[in-house]
Amino acid sequence: INYWILLRNKEFMKYTLCVSSFYIAIYAFLTGSPYVYIDVFGVPTEYYGYLFSLNIIGVMLMSAVNRRIVSAMRLDKLLRYATMFAAICVTIVMILMFMGEHSLWLIVIGSFLFFSMNGVIAAVTNALALERAGKMAGSGAALLGAMQYGSGIISSLVLTFLPNNSAFPMMSVITIFVIICAILAFPRDKRYDH
């Protein structure tokens, strides 16, 4: 019954759907990047891990930054900045791709910038969502985790049905869901207005 109550809790669901949307984009990268890097751009298999590790370094750096600024900034504001930054980065990549720029480094840098924001977005949305769950924080954590990590199914299914001969399908899914994430994060949190 707690899950039903939480599903109807608009503030909890706002942050849960926000992070789930971001994770659809993350899983689109995890699912699509081996094909894009190795098959589309011809990166040798043994070097894929190095390119992928750049994203992990970015997450670690942004997690460290998040720890330093979280006490100085409202969480909802920090979330808006992080999601907007990620959305702007992937949108620029898509615009450049539509203009004919199809370089490996465009994808690597764009992916690094968006993926790095996971160090802020995941931590902040989880904190805000669980705060809104109140006494049902245990059930909230379970529901949040199920939706966040279960969201990978969506990106895998979408990428399966899209034509897969370029970086466009992967970057399209990433861009759409990062923008959805930013839209969900954008309204001010009313709790901070009191």
Where are these regions (language model features)?
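Conserved extracellular-gate-facing transmembrane-helix segments in secondary transporters
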Residues: C18-L30, I38, N118
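Multi-pass alpha-helical transporter architecture, strongest
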Residues: T175-H194
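C-terminal transmembrane helical hairpin of 12-TM major facilitator-type secondary transporters
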Residues: K77-V124
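Small-residue hotspots at the loop-to-helix junctions and early N-terminal turns
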Residues: T45-S53, A141-A142
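Short amphipathic helix-loop junctions that connect adjacent transmembrane helices
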Residues: T31-E46
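Helix-to-loop junctions at the C-terminal end of transmembrane segments
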Residues: M62-K77
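Juxtamembrane intracellular "pre-TM" segments in multi-pass secondary transporters
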Residues: I1-T16
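A late C-terminal transmembrane helix in Major Facilitator Superfamily
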Residues: F115, N126-F168, V173-I174
